[in-house]
Amino acid sequence: MRTEKEKMINGDLYEPVDEELMKDRLHARKLTRLFNQTIETDIEKRTNLLKELLGGAKDNVYIEPNFKCDYGYNIHVGENFFANFDCIMLDICPIRFGDNCMLAPGVHIYSATHPLHPDERNSGKEYGEPVTIGDNVWIGGGAIINPGVTIGDNVVVVGAGAVVTKNVQSNVVIGGNPARVIKQLVV
């Protein structure tokens, strides 16, 4: 029989009040609190805390405080990753970033969602859908990336305040609510 954690990571309905998951969330809260309290010049401490928190991080990862996430271990970032102030990642399912990604202040990325039917939703169970963000992506300030979205590679730019509800092809600028293609980019 699968654990609630296995169900969660696989995107199946699961019980978020499971003891193991509650301990994991508390551990992530502790690490993010310690990270958010670091001083600006203590890059080594910040880097070590991020390596302990995140599920995978290549070289040159920089995140500005305040940063918040559910578990951390479902967040995987490529080389040259930068997230500015006040980014939030609800990572009940994997959130994966390619190389050379930049997040402006206040970006929210959600892999968590809830059943639509009220009886099922009121049971307290939830589920998620993974989010994948390709290489060379810049996400503008206050943008929201919803569960299940895949963003392509090569100079994808998500405009400030965009609400991304559907997959995004490569080589485009998107913006709006819901986000739509504004411009095709030639790479």
Describe the predicted segments one by one:
Residues 10, 139, 158-160, 174-175:
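Short glycine-rich loop/turn motifs that provide flexible caps or phosphate-binding loops at active sites
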